[in-house]
Amino acid sequence: MAKQGSKEKKGYPELKEVIKATCKIRVGPGKETLTEGNCLWALKTIDFIFEDLKTEPWTITKMYTVWDRLKGLTPEETSKREFASLQATLACIMCSQMGMKPETVQAAKGIISMKEGLHENKEAKGEKVEQLYPNLEKHREVYPIVNLQAGGRSWKAVESVVFQQLQTVAMQHGLVSEDFERQLAYYATTWTSKDILEVLAMMPGNRAQKELIQGKLNEEAERWVRQNPPGPNVLTVDQIMGVGQTNQQASQANMDQARQICLQWVITALRSVRHMSHRPGNPMLVKQKNTESYEDFIARLLEAIDAEPVTDPIKTYLKVTLSYTNASTDCQKQMDRTLGTRVQQATVEEKMQACRDVGSEGFKMQLLAQALRPQGKAGHKGVNQKCYNCGKPGHLARQCRQGIICHHCGKRGHMQKDCRQKKQQGNNRRGPRVVPSAPPML
């Protein structure tokens, strides 16, 4: 049993870099990231569920096989939360394996849901489609909607190369930049409405900007409802946004107008938010000055947000978000110390209470005291120094006259890292044990 436990502790070396990348994905906006233990929990759980796949290497093909099998399982009522966490963690690992870098777990699930169209019914329908349309692969190299030679249309998920190119443009130039708008308008001409909105949601960018974009899309939808009363040949908002449609239905010719309207709404929203960003008085440009108190900064910020022509929920979101992101470094550190992990969701009043003393003489004296506090260096000698070897004050461990003691075997003359007894056990190069644990989400 001891040998078996030692072998399991080795983990999954072929996924070392993948797990490292997965640990950068957040459970949600502003929340904690996944841990190595979360990833190991998911992988070990999958090995227990599908024992026939346990010996196979963790390739992307195996991950898609596991993903398809998990979709066919129905968990018990008491295990639904753990099952949902298992699927979400696997989606994050799959994205990292493919080289993608989603910001949140929800974004990773969206990426996999987009790409799984390539794998649905692949074995059952692949040969038949190739026989009917031998030139299909040549025509559907890039675009999700493909015109077939025999008539009709087929759908293919957005290529990862195109998705990564859009991600790069969004990171370099900004989500609402003209460069990103041009790239999106070029590629999205043959995307379904669902493709357009999902790709936009998974792009990196300022959360406040994304909230403003969503607000502009809602305004366009409300304007469409007012100007187009329900009728037999009138498109509904759900049809335009691709709600309740399969990918095959959304790719047909009768949905061309809906896709064009959806793309135009998205471009209009991007331009509106971009114009807001460059307009004087834009809330996202209101930042706390070095000599400005947090209360004065909040007063300017709230005034700018209240002047924006957006809905109340968006105003509330901007107040909660920008009151932290646009604050000074000292105020952000103070809020982190006082409010902890919920700093992004805390109210403006709580943040003002946390920063009430920032900038005062007492706060400056506290910072000065921390900066001048001895850090245990060789130049700082005093009675408060304590030797970790003999436990007596007045000197450091390297100055101790009693000699070096090994904390592993208790003998003198060598340190723990050089202990021969430790080397004989074969554990000298192993790091701390990572305990598999379910991710705290869903």
From Swiss-Prot:
Region entry Disordered: which residue ranges?
420-442
Record Pfam families? Gag_p24 (PF00607), Gag_p24_C (PF19317), zf-CCHC (PF00098)
Give the location of motif PTAP/PSAP motif in residue numbers.
436-439
Q: Which InterPro entries match?
A: Gag_p24_C, Primate_lentivir_Gag_pol-like, Retrov_capsid_C, Retrov_capsid_N, Znf_CCHC, Znf_CCHC_sf
User: Where is the site labelled Cleavage?
Assistant: 363-364
- Gene Ontology, cellular component aspect: viral capsid
An example Gene Ontology molecular-function term: zinc ion binding
CCHC-type zinc-finger residues: 385-402, 404-421
Q: What is a biological process (GO) this protein takes part in? A: viral translational frameshifting
What UniProt keywords are attached to this protein's entry? Capsid protein, Host-virus interaction, Metal-binding, Repeat, Viral budding, Viral budding via the host ESCRT complexes, Viral release from host cell, Virion, Zinc, Zinc-finger
What's said on domains?
Late-budding domains (L domains) are short sequence motifs essential for viral particle budding. They recruit proteins of the host ESCRT machinery (Endosomal Sorting Complex Required for Transport) or ESCRT-associated proteins. Nucleocapsid protein p14 contains one L domain: a PTAP/PSAP motif, which interacts with the UEV domain of TSG101.
* Family indicated by similarity: Belongs to the Ovine/caprine lentivirus group gag polyprotein family.
Name this protein carries in UniProt: Gag polyprotein
Per the UniProt entry, what species is this protein from, by scientific name? Maedi visna virus (strain 1514) (MVV)
